[in-house]
Amino acid sequence: MNINKSNLIWLDLEMTGLEPETDKILEIATVVTDADLNILAEGPTIAIHQSNELLDNMDEWCTTQHGKSGLTARCKASTYDEAYAVEQTIAFLKQWVPAGASPMCGNSIGQDRRFMNKYMRELEDFFHYRNLDVSTIKELARRWKPEVLAQVNKKGSHLALDDIKDSIMELKVYREKFFNL
């Protein structure tokens, strides 16, 4: 383990829906990379227990997707809550990055920040206020160099760890093919 302020923290949450006022977090995963996007470590992937009532009332997309991936069943069987997930995730991150140093990295992470602000504030506060949002670059590529998008091959499993790895791979493609670095 090497604590380095240049390391990047990648995070993804899976949720029961898109509204933090009514929906909840189902899963969290983190990955730490160096500044060149090489994976240094995978943090804990934690399925968070949610009530059967909440899980049974997810919208059709979430019910189908999280049922198919096995996430719904993992959440029903889990004994972990948000506080445990925060504690374990911060303990992992402190081994790699000083608090406040890394932007939050991932795809559409503004959404993750909204949920973290409500349910995982201590973890949200661990990040720098800046974001490294791969979806911003995707939107620019769609408009300025759409042929690059065909070179991004994501699994799209909607499991947090897989989604993070997809985001890292996607940014590597953009770095090479869009920014020519």
Swiss-Prot record:
InterPro entries: Exonuclease_RNaseT/DNA_pol3, Oligoribonuclease, RNaseH-like_sf, RNaseH_sf. It is found in: Cytoplasm. Keywords: Cytoplasm, Exonuclease, Hydrolase, Nuclease. GO terms for cellular component: cytoplasm. One of its GO terms (biological process) is DNA metabolic process. Residues 8-171 form the Exonuclease domain. Gene3D superfamilies: Ribonuclease H-like superfamily/Ribonuclease H. Pfam families: RNase_T. Its EC number is 3.1.15.-. 3'-to-5' exoribonuclease specific for small oligoribonucleotides. This is Oligoribonuclease. It comes from Pseudoalteromonas translucida (strain TAC 125). The gene is orn.
